[in-house]
Amino acid sequence: MRITALGTGMPNQTRAAVSISFLVELGNGDKFLFDMGSGSMANLFSIRPDFSRLDKVFASHLHIDHVGDFMGLHIGGWLSGRYTPIHIYGPTGSTPELGTKSFVEGMSKAWAWDLATRSGALPDKGAQIVVHEFDYKQLNEVVYQKNG
């Protein structure tokens, strides 16, 4: 297992400390991204991971320093060889509009033009986002389980 800190800073980032993100790579080739704060995707793209295997993202919560680069990851990963849907695992909100599903719907609307202009040039499945919400009020909830 290899863990790479792509960012460890706060929302008021600097060149040396962008917002939080961790890439976890397993020996079987699986890759997981935990948070994707603003600025962290530049560090991810600089190490040139195999984007075809980077399709699982876990958002601890929806502050900008934890999800600010989600759409950059989504669209950039699609452009870099991830031709399958991206899966985001994130919290519900105290109301539906404060949860991960609503966040993704809002971001998808905001970036609709960008996504539409790339459609047809790349496999459409890569443009899809699958949302998996977990109940933020639950303790010790399993949010992902595969291969054990």
How would you label these PLM feature ranges?
Residues 1-148:
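Binuclear metal-dependent hydrolase catalytic cores
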